[in-house]
Amino acid sequence: MHSVDPTTEQMIRAVLAYAENRLRVLRRMPHPGRGFTQGLTVAEGTVWESTGGYGESALQRYELGAAQPGPRAALPPELFGEGICRIRAHLWQLTWRERVALRWDARSLDLLSTIPFNREGWGICAADGCVLTSDGTSELVRRDPATLEPLEVIRVRLDGERVTDLNDLEWAAGRVWANLFGQRYLVGIDPDSGEVTDLVDAKAVMERHWGDPEAVLNGVAALPGDGEFLLTGKNWRSMYHVQLVDDRPRKQPARLLAG
C-alpha cells in the first residue's frame, strides 16, 4: 500500500498558508459509473476515463455532463489501469505494476497494441511534442509520444525540496498539473526546470467526500477556459468543473519555509 510522504505534505501545508490558488466550483456533474478513477482526459466535450482494480480495470468514454456511462472496454484481469492521455486518434493507458502500456483507438475503444514500459505507471499527459509520465515519486519522465521511449527525467522541486506522490497529470497553459496521491492538493510544474510554480488546495471539492479513506482526489483534465479543469476522485459520485482563482499575493517559497 502506497503511503503519503509526510515531508511533502508538511512543506506544502506551510506554503499554502501564505500563497494559494483557490478553486471556484462552476458546475457539479454526475460521475458516470462512479469508477475507481485512475486517469482522465477531455477533448471537444468527450471524456475518457481509466479505472483501476485487478479484474475491474476499464477504459470508458462518455459525454461531459452525462449521467450514465458510455462505451466501455475491460482490461485483462491481470492489469491494473492507470493514467491515460490522447494523442490525436489514439489513447495511451498506463498500468500500475505490470510494466506495460496499452494503445487504444479513441473512438472505437479497440485495443491496438501493448508495449513494454520501464517504470510503474501512474499519470500521463500529452505536452508540447512529447508525453510526460509520473510514477508516484518526485520524478516526471519526458517520452516519445509514438513509442513512450524515455527521453529525459525531470526532478520536481519546491524551493529545492523534492515533491513526491505525483499522480494523475494534465498539461495546460505551459504547465504540468498533478494531483498529489492521498492529498487534497494540485501542483503546477514548470516542465523545463521541474520547479513547482502553482499550489492549489482542492478542499472545495474534497470536503464533500471525507469519510471514505479510498475516495481520494484522482483525476484532473483541462477544459476550455482560463484556468478551468475537470476534477474527480476514486468512487466519487460527482465530477467538478472548477476554475483556479489566484487571490493571494505571491511570496517566495524560500522565505515561507524559513518561517
Where do the model's predicted regions map?
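Short loop/turn segments that connect beta-strands within beta-propeller blades
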Residues: E63-A67, D105-L109, P145-L148, D190-G194, ...
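Conserved beta-strand positions in repeat-built beta-propeller and related beta-rich domains
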Residues: W48-G55, L91-E98, V131-T137, A178-G182, ...
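A short helix->beta-strand "capping" segment at the edge of beta-propeller domains
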Residues: R13-G33, L64-Q68
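Beta-rich, blade/repeat-based domains predominating
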Residues: G33-E44, P77-I87, F117-V131, G160-G174, ...
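Blade-loop segments of beta-propeller domains
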Residues: A67-R103, L109-G123
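A short beta-strand motif characteristic of beta-propeller blades
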Residues: R24-P30, Q68-A74, D110-I115, E152-E161, ...
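Hydrophobic, well-structured mid-protein blocks that either form specific transmembrane helices
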Residues: A101-D159
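Beta-strand-rich domains and repeat architectures in extracellular enzymes and scaffolds
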Residues: L26-A58, R72-C85, W122, G233-Y240
